[in-house]
């Protein structure tokens, strides 16, 4: 974009030459995704359960929600009868560091996500702990919603408790993102491991 602006300035004879022509753009370093192997799912979920976080992280593993989508869930987003979660909002940090409720990243991100009956049962049990709170996963400290970064920190603690190597929270959703789902066998193994928990 900057190059185009300077090209316009050269064309209009505002400057003699485009100073960006000699610039070399740095290469964007891709971060390799790590997948939680199916054989580690049980350990991961047991560690989440010991911290009282099983419903949240079980839902994450079966739905692949983004952290901001997970924290923005309300009880009204759960359709118990049809076993779906409505994803229509997310919490993100604005430049001031404050949380803002926004639409999801893209229009296709506004969706209904099917979840297994076990996830529904865990969510109903979680709701019974705080029936008057509108948030699906309120913070036990404040009763308000979690900050999205707090979810990431909890994920790191769960990995440590389970003795598992570091995997980014974002990578938990890897098998659920259509354009990255290449290994159907691995996806089936992961689904089976979650069902067996």
Where is each model-derived feature located?
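Short, polar N-cap/turn motifs at the start of nucleic acid-interacting alpha helices
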Residues: 77-84, 184-197
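N-terminal DNA-binding recognition helix of tyrosine site-specific recombinases/integrases
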Residues: 1-21, 66
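Short pre-functional
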Residues: 3-7, 54-71, 178-179
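Long, amphipathic, Lys/Arg-enriched alpha-helical "connector/arm" segment
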Residues: 22, 26-53, 62-65, 73, ...
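DNA breakage-rejoining catalytic core of tyrosine-based enzymes
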Residues: 11-17, 27-46, 88, 95-116, ...
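Short, basic (Lys/Arg/His-rich) helix/loop patches that form interaction surfaces
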Residues: 42-53, 63, 113, 127-145, ...
């Amino acid at each position: 974009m900057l190059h185009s602006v300077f090209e316009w300035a050269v064309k209009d004879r505002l400057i003699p030459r485009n100073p960006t022509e000699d610039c070399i753009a740095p290469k964007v370093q891709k971060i390799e995704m790590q997948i939680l192997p199916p054989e580690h799912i049980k350990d991961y979920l047991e560690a989440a359960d010991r911290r009282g976080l099983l419903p949240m992280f079980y839902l994450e593993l079966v739905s692949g929600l983004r952290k901001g989508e997970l924290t923005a869930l309300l009880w009204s987003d759960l359709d118990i009868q049809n076993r779906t979660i409505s994803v229509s909002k997310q919490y993100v940090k604005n430049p001031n560091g404050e949380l803002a409720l926004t639409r999801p990243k893209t229009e296709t991100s506004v969706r209904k996500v099917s979840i297994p009956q076990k996830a529904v049962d865990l969510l109903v049990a979680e709701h019974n702990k705080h029936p008057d709170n509108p948030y699906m996963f309120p913070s036990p400290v404040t009763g308000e919603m979690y900050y999205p970064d707090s979810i990431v920190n909890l994920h790191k603690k769960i990995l440590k408790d389970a003795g598992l190597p570091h995997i980014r929270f974002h990578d938990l959703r890897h098998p659920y993102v259509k354009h990255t789902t290449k290994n159907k066998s691995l996806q089936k193994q992961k689904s089976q491991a979650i069902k067996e928990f």
